[in-house]
C-alpha cells in the first residue's frame, strides 16, 4: 500500500488544502492519504490556534474522498516534531510505502525543521506548487542540498518506488487561499 502523509496545523483547513490532497492522490498514485492534523507547530505561535478538535472536525467536513483519512494520532505525542512523528508512523506500519507531502510554501523553511535532512533521507517527498512559490523553491536550502535527488515531474507516479532521498515538484492548479489570510479576515 502507498500512503501519502499530509501534515499541518490546518488552522483553518480550506479548499487549497483539499486541492493539494486531490493533486497528490491523482499524481502520486496513492492508495490513501493520511491528513495529519497536528496539535501545534513548534515554528508557529499558538496564540491563534483553534482547538485540535475543531480543526479535525473542519478537516473532516472538507474531505469527501474516501481515500483521505483525517487523523490526529499526534495528539498522544503533544507538540511533536515531524521527524519524530514520521519515525513512529513508519515503525507502526513497516509494510506501507509512505510519501511526505507538502505545499511549496513550506519548502522555503523546510531547513528550519528539526532533523529535516533525516526526513528527506527517510521519506520520498512530493512538493505541491503554491502561488508565489514556483520559482523561489529552486533556491531553497532543501532543493539545493538534494538537487541530485529530484525526479522529473513526469515520474511522480513512481516516486513511491524510489529510495529516499527522492523528491518531486508537482505543478498544477493552485489555490490562492491561505490559512493565515483566512484567520486575519475573521479578526
From Swiss-Prot:
Annotated catalysed reactions: nicotinate beta-D-ribonucleotide + ATP + H(+) = deamido-NAD(+) + diphosphate
A single GO molecular function term of this UniProt record: ATP binding
Presence of the UniProt keyword NAD in the record: yes
Single biological process term from Gene Ontology: NAD biosynthetic process
Coiled coil: none
Family (UniProt): Belongs to the NadD family.
Function, in words: Catalyzes the reversible adenylation of nicotinate mononucleotide (NaMN) to nicotinic acid adenine dinucleotide (NaAD).
Protein name: Probable nicotinate-nucleotide adenylyltransferase
Amino acid at each position: 500500500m502507498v500512503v501519502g502523509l499530509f501534515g499541518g496545523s490546518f488552522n483553518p483547513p480550506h479548499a487549497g488544502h483539499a486541492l493539494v490532497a486531490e493533486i497528490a492522490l491523482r499524481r502520486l498514485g496513492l492508495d490513501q492519504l493520511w491528513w495529519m492534523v497536528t496539535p501545534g507547530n513548534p515554528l508557529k505561535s499558538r496564540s491563534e490556534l483553534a482547538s485540535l478538535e475543531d480543526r479535525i472536525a473542519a478537516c473532516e467536513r472538507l474531505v469527501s474522498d474516501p481515500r483521505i483519512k483525517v487523523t490526529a494520532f499526534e495528539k498522544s505525542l503533544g507538540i511533536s516534531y515531524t521527524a519524530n512523528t514520521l519515525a513512529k508512523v513508519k515503525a507502526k506500519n513497516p509494510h506501507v510505502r509512505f510519501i511526505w507531502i507538502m505545499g511549496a510554501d513550506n519548502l522555503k523553511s523546510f531547513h528550519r525543521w528539526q532533523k529535516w535532512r533525516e526526513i528527506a533521507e527517510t521519506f520520498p517527498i512530493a512538493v505541491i506548487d503554491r502561488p508565489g512559490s514556483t520559482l523561489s523553491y529552486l533556491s531553497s536550502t532543501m532543493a539545493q542540498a538534494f538537487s541530485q535527488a529530484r525526479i522529473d515531474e513526469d515520474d511522480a507516479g513512481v516516486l513511491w518506488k524510489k529510495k529516499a532521498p527522492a523528491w518531486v515538484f508537482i505543478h498544477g492548479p493552485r489555490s490562492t487561499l491561505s490559512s493565515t489570510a483566512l484567520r486575519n479576515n475573521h479578526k
